């Protein structure tokens, strides 16, 4: 059984009732894990097979970044690859578009992280690469890596069209990869799009859960203080 989890933002208690009552669950988190240590993933892993993509909040602090990329859990990040999970080919596009790198449909400022570093002053370089913030920025190279591969499902943090804040480049990627389902997080609502595209799009909202067909198992409203 595959479950898709919307942005947890550091809280995972809502997931346990669903992974404890089922056997052989693969849990796929759609970004914004917002961890301070990797302990929470270690606890979840006792009950399910964990996969994820990163979101914009996963490079907001060094601790959030290191909880993923400084731990063994970085191997479970689906970003920029296709992995067979329980017989389903799942492609991952983590992160968000940012104007300093690329804000489609505008032309990109940089093609990939190496290009960014070549034209950046030394004080902007962090740990030998792009700044912490841009470790979760989408570069054109990320799309290029995926677009010549095939998958059944595309997961992303950013939304495709027709979301008002969605990006056509994600729709184009889904078409090239031949997927039948797209799941995304980032925007905290829960809804399934009705579109002309030959694939189903599901927005899995804040601390919510959906099954592999895009049916909601848990819908949560983000009532945190702004």
Curated annotation (Swiss-Prot):
Q: Which SUPFAM superfamilies match?
A: Metallo-dependent phosphatases (SSF56300)
Superkingdom, taxonomy of origin: Bacteria
**Where in the sequence is the signal peptide annotated?**
none
Q: What InterPro entries does the database record attribute to this sequence?
A: Calcineurin-like_PHP_ApaH, Metallo-depent_PP-like, P-Estase_HI0762_prd
Any single GO molecular-function term of the entry would be: hydrolase activity
Q: What is this protein called?
A: Uncharacterized protein HI_0762
What organism does the record attribute this protein to? Haemophilus influenzae (strain ATCC 51907 / DSM 11121 / KW20 / Rd)
